[in-house]
Amino acid sequence: MSMLCYTLIITLLIGIWAAPKSEDNVPLGSPATSDLSVTSCTKTHEALKTSRNTDQHYPAPKKEEDQEFGSAANIIVDPKLFQKRRFQSPRVLFSTQPPPLSRDEQSVDDANSLNRNIRAKREDHPVHNRGEYSVCDSVNVWVANKTTATDIRGNVVTVMVDVNINNNVYKQYFFETKCRNPNPVPTGCRGIDARHWNSYCTTTNTFVKALTMEGNQASWRFIRIDTACVCVISRKNENFG
């Protein structure tokens, strides 16, 4: 009886030892592990390939300058911004066509200009009578492509060149005055007594309200532009004997 029990126990142990092992306990290098490795590598390769194909569908990120320019070109401005008189400046004009430089030229049509009262002010320049001369010679010009300027705080800001209003593109013009020549006469400013005074002509600036970019929105800011040509004089050193 005891021998029969021992025989059954040994047979049972041999059967358990000969049973196939699970994949979790398979040693490295066995066929099961190789199949898992190949499958894993194949999935990884397909994932990388899919990632590359996905990247090709999306363009590379744009530069900061390109993003700023693109956003500035696509911004639509609310017409209500132009209804407040405190934002209007006689030297800033929004128009679909170049404005005239003098009253002798053809006026800008009211339908093509947002600043209708500004055009009239620009035409009221004083006309000198014959025999009258300016101390300095100046030149007036409409600046149409001003992209940057210095604001009243001394910071460089982005100026909106084109403005989209009700699906109409208006250009922002600045009426600037500059000196034609720092020395209109050999001695400096015209009409200054060169025996006692040194003189020269220089361009001066003032601040006007202009439409600028602040992030992705349009905003009014005071910016500096050239507005006059003045004479600067200084007394000459006199030797007293």
Curated annotation (Swiss-Prot):
Keywords, ordered alphabetically: Cleavage on pair of basic residues, Disulfide bond, Glycoprotein, Growth factor, Lipid-binding, Metalloenzyme inhibitor, Metalloprotease inhibitor, Protease inhibitor, Secreted, Signal, Toxin
GO molecular function, one term: growth factor activity
Disulphide bond pairs: C136-C201, C179-C229, C189-C231
GO CC field: axon; dendrite; extracellular space; synaptic vesicle
Gene3D superfamilies, sorted: Cystine-knot cytokines (2.10.90.10)
One of the Pfam families matching this protein, by short name: NGF
Residues cleaved off as propeptide: 19-122
Compositionally biased intervals (Basic and acidic residues): 47-65
Residues bearing attached sugar chains per UniProt: N145
Main location: secreted
Subcellular location(s) per record: Secreted
Stretches the record annotates as Disordered: 47-69
GO biological process, one term: nerve development
Region forming the signal peptide: 1-18
UniProt key word tRNA processing: no
Superkingdom classification of source: Eukaryota
InterPro entries assigned to the protein according to its UniProt record, in alphabetical order: Cystine-knot_cytokine, Nerve_growth_factor-like, Nerve_growth_factor-rel, Nerve_growth_factor_bsu, Nerve_growth_factor_CS, Venom_nerve_growth_factor
Function (record text): Nerve growth factor is important for the development and maintenance of the sympathetic and sensory nervous systems. It stimulates division and differentiation of sympathetic and embryonic sensory neurons as well as basal forebrain cholinergic neurons in the brain. Its relevance in the snake venom is not clear. However, it has been shown to inhibit metalloproteinase-dependent proteolysis of platelet glycoprotein Ib alpha, suggesting a metalloproteinase inhibition to prevent metalloprotease autodigestion and/or protection against prey proteases.
Quaternary structure and interacting proteins, as annotated: Homodimer; non-covalently linked.
Family under the similarity heading: Belongs to the NGF-beta family.
Protein name in UniProt: Venom nerve growth factor
Organism: Bothrops jararacussu (Jararacussu)
High-level lineage: Eukaryota, Metazoa, Chordata, Craniata, Vertebrata
